[in-house]
Amino acid sequence: MHRTVFAILAALTLFMHACGGESASNESRPDASTTTTAGIDFQSVAGVLLTRLDLQPDERVLLVGLPGRFDPLMPLLREGVEAAGAVDLGVWAVGAGAPGDWSTDFTRALIGQDSGALVGLLSDVDAALMLPGANTGHAVYAAMQQVLREDRGRTIHFHWLGAYNLDGTLRDIDEMVDDFYVRVLADTDYEALAAAQVAFEHAMRGATVRVTTSAGTDISFEIGDRPVTKQDGDASAARAGMGRNLIDREVELPAGAIRVAPIEGSVAGTVVFPPSVWGEERTENLTLRFERGVMVSLEAARGAEAALAEIEAAGDAGKAFREFALGFNPLLAIPTSGERWIPYYGYGAGVVRLSLGDNTELGGAVGGGYVRWNFFVDATVTVDGETWVEGGRLVR
């Protein structure tokens, strides 16, 4: 079970006790089975998902989702699967109330199976779409992740969640958010997004990346030959075949972030967090200092003992620097006028993530299972002294 904490002043802090997809946590959120469908152009959404999936004849495709507000999407996707000459395996429901036509011989064969058997049954699924309401707490979802770890198949993560108020509380997925996400899916320039991410990856290779914030964060690292996962919306089989880790085969839509586990021994410096919750207690001015990728000191104006207890309870993973991520999608940026909110997990252009814990899904060397995500919305990022992000704004 994932547990989520999110706090924002100059940064966002998201904590999870298990690895998974970007939005696969079981955080408190509006029920996907009861929220109105108003504002969602399902035909447009289905078209984008199918285009990004780029199905080939005879590929076997499974949908995984929660019965409810996204029911109208399912027949559109299944029709598209068949139109591409692929094989529709049906829809695995992660909750009660599924329409009868979701079930197929394939999905019925999954009922009651243990995790090992599920992995075997799913091993010849070429593509799965993880739709709203599905997450890593569901057995079929988790088993499909294991298939991906074995360098087989691919998935689209399409959760329609991750909207936050600026104070860090979850924002309802209302008609405004629905319209916003539909536009982002349809209007993202996927080619330009991919080009920007490739350029940044090339800049990082052989260089020193430095992240600073006005609160005092100042940390540097190198990525060596580590895989850089580019969430550019390409969910094709050809792209999955080039994947080097689990998340290369898990494609997020909406798209926008790059993710990398730096060479652990290269990580050095300080991360200063905003007021946030650690070990169920509020902390202020929490400051962690890292040498060779490992936390060597912890200070805080308030809550130091609670933060240290959480970190020590996680073992070595709790003290390890996990990940650097950077958002590139300008359409997911925090709005500069009107209502200001954080779209899709803060993955808009210029948002940085500096995380702690297990980075094996990224191709890193730190295990242990513990993961704490920390999003910063005012960071400056330089690569060998060249500025790419300034004060939370992508400038290249």
Question: What kind of region is each of these model predictions?
Answer:
Residues 283-299:
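Active-site and channel-lining beta-strand-loop segments
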Residues 211, 289, 381:
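Short aromatic-centered micro-motifs
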Residues 202-204, 264, 279-282, 317, ...:
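Short solvent-exposed loop/turn micro-motifs enriched in small/polar/acidic residues
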Residues 351-396:
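Intrinsically disordered terminal and processing segments
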